[in-house]
């Protein structure tokens, strides 16, 4: 009887059973490449790569900042558990961003937003899209970068009960 190759059967944070502490620890150890009991920002990049999502160093530092509740600059097992619970939604947000970022330059312009919304059957003008971008555009460049998009998508005040974007208030 052949045993499964452990290299091809590794669980990922998105598939780990949160109710099984042993499985969680096994996945944590897989990403804690130097075995120091904590995941660095560099090792965190490997976690997201395993889930099929690549983040810039700035984005990884932001994730670390949000998950690192004890503020030691690393992710421990408890913090990793929290990250695993939220990681599928993070991957979904990245996928949604990529859908809107038509030219793949890392920014969503009013024109790109207009194209996608019209394709989805929503009637709006480029000017409407420019107004939608305004409150989200923290750096004032007229576009939405991933960080701004992620902040918008995770802000409960901008989402309605079914998880879709609420129209901007006037």
Curated annotation (Swiss-Prot):
PANTHER family per record: EF-HAND CALCIUM-BINDING DOMAIN CONTAINING PROTEIN
Chain positions found as N-acetylalanine: 2
Keyword Calcium found: yes
Residues engaged in binding Ca(2+) 3: 101, 103, 105, 112
InterPro entries per UniProt: EF-hand-dom_pair (IPR011992), EF_Hand_1_Ca_BS (IPR018247), EF_hand_dom (IPR002048), EF_hand_pair_protein_CML-like (IPR039647)
Signal sequence region: none
Protein name in UniProt: Probable calcium-binding protein CML27
Keywords linked to the UniProt accession: Acetylation, Calcium, Metal-binding, Repeat
Function, in words: Potential calcium sensor.
Species annotation: Arabidopsis thaliana (Mouse-ear cress)
Residue ranges constituting the EF-hand domain according to the UniProt record: 19-54, 55-85, 88-123, 136-159
Binding positions for Ca(2+) 2 per the UniProt entry: 68, 70, 72, 74, 79
GO molecular function per UniProt: calcium ion binding
One GO cellular component term noted in the UniProt record for this chain: cytosol
Binding site for Ca(2+) 4: 137, 139, 141, 143, 148
Stretches that traverse the bilayer: none
Binding site for Ca(2+) 1: 32, 34, 36, 38, 43
Upregulation: By touch.
